[in-house]
Each structure stands twice: as structure tokens, then as C-alpha cells.
Amino acid sequence: MGIKLINIGFGNIVSANRIVAIVSPESAPIKRVIQEARERGVLIDATYGRRTRAVIVTDSDHIILSAVQPETVAHRLNSKDNSKEIESVVDGE
């Protein structure tokens, strides 16, 4: 069974299959996307009060804020060892 989960910091985990984009929050268009998501009620803030370093866009139009660098999240997304470790936890092994 292949549910791949990605740690986005502070023990928060997101389904890798649902991720559309991982971007930096610095540009004005991304800041607008964050504000619009906040107004629509689809913003998930997983920063624990820390500075937002990555913005994760999902296929359900949810916007997830993470305190982890976008490169780190992308590396975890591409890491095969990480997915096996988390899949073992999900499968109960």
C-alpha cells in the first residue's frame, strides 16, 4: 500500500500525492494567494509561530504554510528512504 507522507516540520505530515507545488512565500503573488486562502478558510498554518519559509499548494486548493525551506520539503518528497520509513509507520510495521 503506497501512501507517501512528507514531514513538513514540527511533526506535521502531508500526503505527497496531494502536493501540487512547493514555493517560497517571498513574492507578491504568493502573498496574495496566502491572503485569499485565509479569507476562504483553506489556509493551514503549520509554522508553530515561526517564520513561513515554504508554501505548499495542494490539489484541493488548500494552502499549507511550513517553517521548513522549500528545498528541504522537495528533498523529502524525492527521498525514497523517508517514504519507506513513514509508510512503515502508517502500515503498522
Curated annotation (Swiss-Prot):
Parts forming coiled coils: none
Disulfide bond annotation, renumbered to this chain: none
Database matches in Pfam families: RemA-like
InterPro entries in alphabetical order: RemA-like
Domain of life: Bacteria
Family to which this protein belongs: Belongs to the RemA family.
HAMAP family membership: RemA
Protein name in UniProt: Putative regulatory protein Clos_1422
Phylogenetic placement of the source organism: Bacteria, Bacillati, Bacillota, Clostridia, Peptostreptococcales
